[in-house]
């Protein structure tokens, strides 16, 4: 950004990695509560429901000539009414590659185009994606704090799953520690 080459329309984006129940989704809720004084200012997209090829039309809406054209998509409708929000893509590794292509457009340009051809601004969102990729490495290590070797194994699993251009658009990747007994109580 010091060089002046950063895209000011690019939304802040984070990939939270860790075990199930380690607080990834809860942190996203707290971010929405902190920034917007309302945890409901979060748009949650469950990517396990977006594993089919037609899932893009669920997010963006169908194109002209298809059933439901006038209804719009879930994501585009939500972003029209809540342009300032935390956008949570839960379990992003389960999304169809076409959905990831739409997300790539959002992370790159700060906008997406609905099925009706309307441009939706995403530049004021904070995009948070959660994933359990590499969880087996975190689970098998000793202690609750993530070790450097474990971090490398987790990042290797992430690099195998996602395309480099997708990972390069993410502002920060955060690996969550295992929950300790002290943290639970």
Task: Enumerate the language-model features and the residues they cover.
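AAA+ P-loop NTPase nucleotide-binding core of proteostasis motors
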Residues: 1-185
């Amino acid at each position: 950004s010091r060089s002046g080459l950063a895209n000011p329309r690019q939304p802040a984006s984070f990939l939270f990695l860790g075990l199930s129940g380690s607080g990834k989704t809860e942190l996203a809720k707290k971010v929405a509560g902190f920034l917007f004084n309302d945890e409901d200012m979060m748009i949650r997209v469950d990517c396990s429901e977006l594993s089919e090829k037609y899932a893009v039309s669920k997010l963006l809406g169908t194109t002209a000539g298809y059933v439901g054209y006038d209804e719009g998509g879930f994501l585009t409708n939500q972003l029209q009414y809540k342009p300032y929000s935390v956008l949570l893509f839960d379990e992003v590794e389960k999304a169809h590659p076409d959905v990831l292509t739409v997300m790539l457009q959002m992370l790159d340009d700060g906008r997406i185009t609905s099925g009706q051809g309307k441009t939706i601004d995403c530049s004021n969102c904070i995009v948070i994606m959660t994933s359990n990729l590499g969880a087996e490495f975190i689970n098998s290590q000793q202690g609750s704090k993530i070790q450097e070797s474990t971090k490398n194994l987790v990042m290797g699993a992430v690099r195998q799953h996602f395309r480099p251009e997708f990972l390069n658009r993410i502002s920060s990747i955060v690996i969550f520690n295992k929950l300790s007994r002290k943290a639970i109580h």
